[in-house]
Amino acid sequence: MENKNEFIIDILKECSALLEGHFLLSSGRHSDKYCQCAKLLQYPDKAEKVLKVVVDKIKDLDFDMVVGPAMGGIIVAYELGRQLKKPNIFTERQEGVMTLRRGFEIQKGKKVIITEDVVTTGKSSLEVAKLIEKLGGEVVAICSIVDRRDDNIELPYNLYSSVKIDVKSYEEKDCPLCKEGLEYIKPGSRNIK
């Protein structure tokens, strides 16, 4: 597993998808590292290789479709759907609420895999899961390129990722970078106040 992790990390670094500095994550937490998977996803050949790791882990699961939240989950959903020959759609926020638009639907009883680029707290995935279940679908699993959860963050669904990266994240009040007076960069896509 370590060699596979190193292989994925090397690709992420090659694409400048692993950044260092002081970041405000979309979860609201602070970190000294940030995974900007959009930098990976701009290269279809590299995205295919990285997501093949996830495909190999989930290919025997019973599911009907793949759903990714905008923005980070859209291309991941597409690529997993493409490799597994499953339909894929995406959710997006409308007035702060995760919704299906553009004529997308999840039919009652459909088994769904949720995709993300990076999972830190799982908040976006859980919002999508709530929507899927409200519509009568069943969440089978969550998939991501990067699992960067702290050890104390558990999800109610299995998470299958290309790579697990141990990166410390902090509540703002506990952030050592804030205490040093370093300004943060807010690269995430969720609207944070």
Curated annotation (Swiss-Prot):
It is an enzyme of class 2 (transferase). It catalyses: orotidine 5'-phosphate + diphosphate = orotate + 5-phospho-alpha-D-ribose 1-diphosphate. The keyword Magnesium applies. Pfam families: Pribosyltran. GO terms for biological process: 'de novo' UMP biosynthetic process; pyrimidine nucleobase biosynthetic process. InterPro entries: OPRT (IPR023031), Orotate_PRibTrfase_bac (IPR006273), PRibTrfase_dom (IPR000836), PRTase-like (IPR029057). 5-phospho-alpha-D-ribose 1-diphosphate binds at E116, D117, V118, V119, T120, T121, G122, K123, S124. Its EC number is 2.4.2.10. Keywords: Glycosyltransferase, Magnesium, Pyrimidine biosynthesis, Transferase. Orotate binds at T120, R148. SUPFAM superfamilies: PRTase-like. Gene3D superfamilies: 3.40.50.2020. It comes from the Bacteria. Pathway: Pyrimidine metabolism; UMP biosynthesis via de novo pathway; UMP from orotate: step 1/2. One of its GO terms (molecular function) is orotate phosphoribosyltransferase activity. NCBIfam families: pyrE_Therm. Catalyzes the transfer of a ribosyl phosphate group from 5-phosphoribose 1-diphosphate to orotate, leading to the formation of orotidine monophosphate (OMP). This is Orotate phosphoribosyltransferase. It comes from Clostridium tetani (strain Massachusetts / E88). The lineage of its organism: Bacteria, Bacillati, Bacillota, Clostridia, Eubacteriales.
